Structure formats: structure tokens, C-alpha cells
């Protein structure tokens, strides 16, 4: 009898997960055809075309010399390049990329449901998962050539296996946590700091054994090692990306705002700041070009902050509030559409209430809160684009679910 009931519940859950995946997949398809990008633009287009035409991972070239690039994290560029090997025409190629992002997004919904199961009742799990699936920003992002969907998928995978390790420290969970960690490091430069924070949390608060910690670090290193070795051999530097200077300057210069203005990599050579333009023009055109260029921007960004610390601290706080809630001065034409800002504002407010109501003795929830705070604090040092919000929406929904669970238990008792 017990086994029959267990099997029935497992079958019921399987059907639910299949429904969540299929539902999420189908509702995203029309968005591709209505709002979907139609070509590779800006940095992604340059790198992928150079990979395709010349076999060079490069963003800048001087004639026939292609500068080995460190500016862009490599994972999404190679993700885009993977679909190029099938020699689709441009229209089909873009559609295939966008459909692949729909698949990742739909799997994210399924994994997100499993995360919620660790904390909440079945009704709240389903509610939170449907909010994530139907969240307009999440749906819209699938139609854009951007790394944010891949980041969201990997981040949710990371959270799932991290939380699983807290309960069951086995090699299976360690392998998938390490894989997600390595890929996230190859996708987002700031994740290195978040990874180290997570490892420290496992060691200090969860107190998992040293052997497991070392295996996680080793396997993560194995994932990033091919690209890391490329940078060591070709550019004599131990790093994944080298764009912290540009990103710091983009978010902290006299003309900037929360979004860092509309500076793209190619526009940096047309500066109104004559002194900065002169420094850029003096950078030697060799294989270390991007490294030395980033040093120029790093120096300039630090100088800006030192010259007017009150202004840039105020801007930093403004970026934090814009990241947590909404940006009151966004340049994005769709940002103030009610389908965007109302869900964002609602889930942002309810998530803060959820954090306040959360159990302070829960190591799992405490980790998510700590990760959330540190992530927001790090990213806000630079600039906040509207799509960045999707990276923290899953955590905000989890925190909101704490509030929804509180309402359910206290006002809808059965």
C-alpha cells in the first residue's frame, strides 16, 4: 500500500514537471517571432564572426593581427559559436539560438520547482514556480541574444546542487555543483568572488569535510582550466577575463548613470574626454592591447571615484536600489511598460518582507540571503542593465514565497 502511494505521488510529480516544462516552452515561442533578435550585434557579433571566419577569439584587430581577447567572458561566445558549425543561414541560425534559450529557460523552471520543494508547501511551490515561468522579463529575455538566460539556468542549477550538498554530501551533487560553478566563472567574472563565498560558507557553517571542499575546487578548476591555460600560454596572465577596469569606468564616470550610459566596447575610441582618448591612443597595438587598455580604464575609474567620492557613493546606493527594485531613469523603451515594472516592483517588495520573516536558524535560507546581498553589492559597483534583474529574480521569488507561506498559514488556515 505504501509503495503504491509512493509510486502514485512520483508519477503525479513527473506529470507536473513535464507540464511545467511544456507550458514554459510553449508560452515563449510567440515571443521569439514578435520580439526576437534578428542578428548578432556588437561584441557578440564581432567575436563569433572572428571565430567563424578566422578561428580567432578576438574582439579587436589591427589589420591582419587579431588581439587575443580577454574582454568578454568566453562561455556565451562559444555557446553562440557552437550553432555556427551547422552552417545555418543567418535567419535559421538566430532562431535556433533563441529556441535553445527557450529550452534552457524551461528547464530552469523545472529545477526552480525542485528548489522550492526544499522549503515550501506544494501550493506555494507551484505558485512560485508559475510566477517564475510567467515572469515577463524571463519570457522576454529568451528572445534576446544575451547571456542572461544561460546565466539564469546555470545559477539555478548551482543553487539546487549547493542546497542538495547541505543535506546530502555525495559525489553526484559535488560533480554537478562544480560543473555549474566552473561554467558560471566562464560566463560572469564576478562569480569567482561568489564561488569563494559559497565554499567558505560550506566550510564554516555547514562544516562539510575538507576532502569534499577540495574536490569541488579541483573539479571547478578542471572546467575552467582549458581557457585559463590559453590565457597563461598566449597572454602570460592568470585570469578568465580582463574587463574590470572598463566596467568600473563605465559605471563611474562624469557622464554615466545607473545603466552606465550606452557605452559599448567599440564606442570607447570616440571619447569626449581628450585626456582619456589620448591615453587610449597610446596603448601599444600588440597582444597585450586589451590588458593594457583595461588598466587605463581602471586607473580612470578609480580617479573619478577618488575625485568625488560622495557623488559616486550616492550613485552606488542608487544602483543598489535600482537593482533591488526598479530604475527610475531607465533608457530602455520597454522598461516602464506595466507588464515589466509592476511584476518587478511587486516581487521586489514582497521579497524584502520575506527576508524579514525568514527563519534565521535556517542555514539554507541564510546562504541564499547572504549570496543575494553580496551579489547585489558587487554588481552595483559597476552598472545595472535592465536584464541583470533576471539574475536575482529566482532568489527574490524564493524570498517572496516565505511571505506567501506566512500569509497562507496565518490567514488561510484549513
Language model features: what each stretch is:
Residues 21-27, 125-136, 160, 181-185:
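Short helix- or helix-capping micro-motifs
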Residues 99-119, 157-161, 349-356:
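Transmembrane-helix motifs of polytopic, lipid-linked glycan transferases
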Residues 31-42, 54-81, 303-307:
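Membrane-proximal lumenal/periplasmic loop motifs of glycosylation machinery
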Residues 235-318:
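Membrane-proximal stem/loop segments at transmembrane-domain junctions that anchor or position
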Residues 74-78, 86-107, 126, 141-144, ...:
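Loop-to-helix entry region of an early transmembrane alpha helix in multi-pass inner-membrane enzymes
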Residues 95, 107-134, 152-153, 172, ...:
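Transmembrane-helix signature of polytopic, membrane-embedded enzymes
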Residues 119-122, 158-176, 184, 202-208, ...:
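Membrane-interface transmembrane helices that cradle and orient dolichyl/undecaprenyl
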Amino acid at each position: 500500500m505504501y509503495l503504491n502511494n509512493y509510486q502514485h505521488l512520483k508519477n503525479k510529480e513527473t506529470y507536473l514537471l513535464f507540464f511545467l516544462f511544456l507550458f514554459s516552452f510553449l508560452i515563449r515561442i510567440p515571443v521569439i517571432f514578435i520580439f526576437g533578435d534578428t542578428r548578432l550585434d556588437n561584441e557578440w557579433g564581432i567575436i563569433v564572426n572572428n571565430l567563424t571566419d578566422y578561428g580567432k577569439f578576438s574582439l579587436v584587430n589591427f589589420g591582419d593581427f587579431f588581439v587575443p581577447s580577454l574582454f568578454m567572458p568566453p562561455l556565451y561566445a562559444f555557446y553562440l559559436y557552437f550553432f555556427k558549425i551547422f552552417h545555418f543561414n543567418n535567419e535559421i541560425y538566430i532562431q535556433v539560438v533563441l529556441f535553445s534559450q527557450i529550452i534552457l529557460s524551461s528547464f530552469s523552471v523545472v529545477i526552480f520547482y525542485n528548489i522550492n520543494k526544499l522549503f515550501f508547501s506544494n501550493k506555494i511551490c507551484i505558485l512560485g514556480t508559475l510566477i517564475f515561468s510567467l515572469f515577463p522579463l524571463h519570457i522576454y529575455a529568451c528572445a534576446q541574444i544575451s547571456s542572461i538566460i544561460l546565466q539564469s539556468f546555470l545559477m539555478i542549477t548551482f543553487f539546487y546542487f549547493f542546497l542538495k550538498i547541505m543535506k546530502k554530501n555525495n559525489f553526484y551533487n559535488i560533480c554537478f555543483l562544480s560543473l555549474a560553478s566552473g561554467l558560471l566563472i566562464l560566463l560572469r567574472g564576478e562569480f569567482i568572488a561568489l564561488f569563494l563565498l559559497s565554499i567558505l560558507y560550506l566550510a564554516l557553517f555547514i562544516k562539510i569535510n575538507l576532502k569534499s571542499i577540495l574536490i569541488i575546487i579541483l573539479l571547478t578548476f578542471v572546467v575552467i582550466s582549458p581557457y585559463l591555460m590559453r590565457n597563461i600560454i598566449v597572454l602570460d596572465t592568470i585570469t578568465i577575463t580582463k574587463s574590470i577596469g572598463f566596467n568600473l569606468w563605465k559605471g563611474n564616470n562624469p557622464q554615466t548613470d545607473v545603466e552606465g550610459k550606452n557605452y559599448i566596447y567599440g564606442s570607447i575610441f570616440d571619447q569626449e574626454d581628450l585626456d582619456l582618448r589620448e591615453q587610449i591612443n597610446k596603448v601599444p597595438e600588440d597582444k597585450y592591447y586589451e590588458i593594457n587598455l583595461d588598466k587605463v580604464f581602471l586607473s580612470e575609474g578609480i580617479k573619478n571615484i577618488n575625485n568625488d567620492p560622495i557623488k559616486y557613493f550616492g550613485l552606488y546606493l542608487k544602483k543598489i536600489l535600482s537593482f533591488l527594485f526598479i530604475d527610475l531613469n531607465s533608457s530602455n523603451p520597454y522598461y516602464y511598460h506595466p507588464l515589466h515594472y509592476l511584476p518587478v516592483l511587486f516581487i521586489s517588495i514582497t521579497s524584502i518582507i520575506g527576508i524579514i520573516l525568514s527563519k534565521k536558524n535556517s542555514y539554507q535560507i541564510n546562504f541564499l540571503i547572504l549570496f543575494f546581498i553580496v551579489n547585489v553589492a558587487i554588481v552595483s559597483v559597476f552598472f545595472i542593465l535592465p536584464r541583470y534583474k533576471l539574475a536575482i529574480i529566482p532568489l527574490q521569488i524564493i524570498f517572496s514565497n516565505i511571505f506567501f507561506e506566512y500569509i497562507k498559514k496565518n490567514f488561510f488556515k484549513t
